[in-house]
Structure formats: structure tokens, C-alpha cells
Regions:
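Cys-nucleophile CN-hydrolase/nitrilase-fold catalytic domain and related Cys-dependent amidase chemistry
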Residues: 2-80, 147, 151-173
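Active-site flanking residues adjacent to catalytic metal/cofactor-binding acidic residues
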Residues: 19, 121, 178
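Active-site catalytic loop in hydrolytic enzyme cores
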Residues: 40, 66-148, 153-162, 166, ...
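CN hydrolase (nitrilase-like) catalytic-core segments centered on the catalytic cysteine
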Residues: 43-58, 124-213
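Short Pro/Gly-enriched beta-strand edge/turn motifs at strand-loop
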Residues: 58-62, 85-92, 175-179
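Short beta-strand scaffold segments in enzyme catalytic cores
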Residues: 61-63, 74-77, 106, 178, ...
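C-terminal appended segment following the main domain
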Residues: 209-225
Length: 225
């Protein structure tokens, strides 16, 4: 996050969006989760926030959260080292049985623009985006992690943006997604995409497939991402 935040284009923007479970890495195994999950009220997480506090743009990034005995696939909204909101993934895939599902769709305000969050597979369910739009949200942020086995990755390669476009057409919101890319050993690959769609479901900016990078887009008159 610090590396991307140091880029000149980042400092000129209002928001930086990162992928699902970005902080600790997306690995849904009991050993990984029990070792790296973070209580958001703990000193260990506060140290991370302190380190992020000099970053000017608002940050939205995925974390593996521990709350009591439960684990959540969570996205946090961080501004100047302070947690200003969080969203817990509501539609878990079968491989995420170690997580508890969230049950709320909170929104947050950024420079007068109401934003909401869906995490990855949430976008397969129209009600998740509609719950955000019903609260007046203009922007839907989608932290994602689509590192898949090779055959599945090929089958889904063009479907991710197609599904996101459906949510945009249904709600009239802007949509920004941050996804992973590259190969993990010889069995898995992530094609992303990391992209921004306007309310007409046009892709206005996208990181090239199999390229690690970022895009910058102006969303409406007052918010850039």
C-alpha cells in the first residue's frame, strides 16, 4: 500500500482501493487465518494504522478480521490512520467456510460522495449492490481476489467485468474493482481485472491483463480513484 501511495498519481487522488484480504493475503486455511487474523481494536492493528497515517488518500483494503471467536472477510475504510468504516463480506463462497458472513451493507462519505462496498463474489448477487444503492451510494467499491485454477480462470476471464456491468446497469452506480493478477505456481492464475466502470457500464480505465499496476479515474465531479 505504501508503494502505491507514493506514486504521484495516488497522492492526487482521493481514494486508493486494494484487493480482497490484501493485508494478510488470501489463503483460507485454518493455520493461516489463526496466525494472521487481526482484531481491529488490538495494538497490533493500531501499529499498522499508525504506519499508514501519513498517506493522504482514503484507503479501502481487505483484511482477515478476528472478532471474538469469529473470523470475517472484511474491507476497512481508513483515513489518516483511523478506521472510518468496515464491511464484512455477506456472500461467502464454499471455500470460505472458516469465515462468518456479514449481515450489513454500510456506506461511507468521501468528499460528499456516498460510497459502498461489495467484496468479490458479492457481485454475483444483485441484492448486495442494491442494498448499497438504496442508501444513496453513487460508487460501489469491489475488492476482489480472483486467483483461480487454470481452467476456471479461463472460463471466468471475461465474466468478472460482465457481472460487474450488470450490477452497474441495475443501480446506476460507478464501480471500481481492485483485483489480483499473475500466476501462483503452475496451477493458479489471476487475470483480474482491476478497472473502473461508469454508470453506463463502460470500462473507463483498466489495468492490462497479467500486469500489476493501478489505474486512475475521475468519478463524477468531486471524487477521483
Amino acid at each position: 500500500m505504501e508503494t502505491f501511495a507514493r506514486r504521484p498519481a495516488s497522492d492526487a487522488g482521493d481514494l486508493l482501493l486494494f484487493p480482497e484480504c490484501f493485508l494478510q493475503g488470501y489463503l483460507v486455511e485454518s493455520e493461516h487465518i489463526s496466525k494472521y487474523a487481526l482484531d481491529l481494536s488490538a495494538t497490533s492493528f493500531q501499529k499498522i494504522l499508525d504506519r499508514l497515517s501519513p498517506i493522504r488518500p482514503t484507503l479501502v483494503f481487505g483484511v482477515i478480521e478476528q472478532c471474538g471467536a469469529a473470523y470475517f472477510n472484511t474491507a476497512v475504510v481508513v483515513r489518516h490512520g483511523m478506521v472510518e468504516g468496515l464491511y464484512r463480506k455477506t456472500h461467502l463462497v464454499p471455500g470460505e467456510r472458516l469465515f462468518h458472513a456479514g449481515n450489513a451493507h454500510p456506506t461511507f462519505n468521501l468528499n460528499g460522495v456516498t460510497c459502498g462496498i461489495n467484496i468479490c463474489s458479492d457481485t454475483n448477487f444483485p441484492e448486495a449492490a442494491k442494498a448499497v444503492a438504496a442508501q444513496g451510494a453513487r460508487v460501489l467499491l469491489v475488492p476482489s481476489q480472483n486467483m483461480m485454477r487454470l481452467q476456471a480462470a479461463e472460463a471466468w476471464k471475461c465474466r468478472h467485468n460482465a457481472i460487474r456491468a450488470e450490477r452497474v446497469r441495475e443501480t446506476g452506480m460507478w464501480l471500481a474493482s481492485a483485483d489480483v493478477t499473475g500466476a501462483r505456481d503452475e496451477s493458479r492464475v489471476g487475470y483480474g481485472p482491476t478497472s473502473v466502470m461508469n454508470p453506463n457500464a463502460d470500462v473507463v480505465a483498466q489495468v492490462p491483463i497479467m500486469t500489476a499496476g493501478m489505474v486512475v479515474a475521475e468519478i463524477g465531479p468531486t471524487l477521483s480513484n
